[in-house]
Amino acid sequence: MRLLPRLLLLFLLAFPAAVLLRGGPGGSLALAQDPTEDEEIVEDSIIEDEDDEAEVEEDEPTDLAEDKEEEDVSSEPEASPSADTTILFVKGEDFPANNIVKFLVGFTNKGTEDFIVESLDASFRYPQDYQFYIQNFTALPLNTVVPPQRQATFEYSFIPAEPMGGRPFGLVINLNYKDLNGNVFQDAVFNQTVTVIEREDGLDGETIFMYMFLAGLGLLVVVGLHQLLESRKRKRPIQKVEMGTSSQNDVDMSWIPQETLNQINKASPRRQPRKRAQKRSVGSDE
């Protein structure tokens, strides 16, 4: 009987605890925690909104900077409609590295006011982005006044750097001038992609070997022709010319021994028939 109240007390203590752990109908603690979670969610959303506003504020300066850059680009001086320009490369549109490139720029004033041509400049740009400079050449100061309906010609020359040989670059040639009112103009006389040619200095090994090979081949041809002509001369037979024996002087006596010739010369010649007949006639008269 004493254990029964104790067991009942333990049951009363354990049952509510089990119900609370399982989330039963007496779950007031879980309901009490919901407001805190809602507060955390609200705080997170507020923080996210603040981050979005900060990102928007950060993006606005970049947009303003881009707008300023576009305004700067658009504010660059342009060519005047009252002027016309032409360009002529003296040696053609070939750009050898480490060699002088010369061209002439013609300026025509088609307006009614004077133009003051200030300078002429040239530069190599990156082919994919002409805003990126590779090599900037020295500007040529001109300060020349061109009256209305008149023309002027200007000469400019530059030397491409030797390491640029064999690569394409954007060549930009600008003519800067202004009118009497102070309005500044800039005309892109030439704005195209060109290729710098590698300069060939002297003779390379392949060229020298080719010349030596051709010289040796020519010498062999000459020697072969000479040997061919000599062999034909040797094979050609000697034509024997038959000489008559009409006179004694035409006979070749060199093959006869000298002793035999001496004996022939000592022998008395034969008498001719006429001399014998004359002697007989003289004897008959006697």
Swiss-Prot record:
Superkingdom of the source species: Eukaryota
Signal sequence region: 1-21
InterPro entries according to UniProt: TRAP_alpha (IPR005595)
Bilayer-crossing regions: 208-228
Annotated glycan sites: 136, 191
Comp. bias (Acidic residues): 46-75
Main subcellular location of this protein, as a coarse class: endoplasmic reticulum
Record's function text: TRAP proteins are part of a complex whose function is to bind calcium to the ER membrane and thereby regulate the retention of ER resident proteins. May be involved in the recycling of the translocation apparatus after completion of the translocation process or may function as a membrane-bound chaperone facilitating folding of translocated proteins.
Entry protein name: Translocon-associated protein subunit alpha
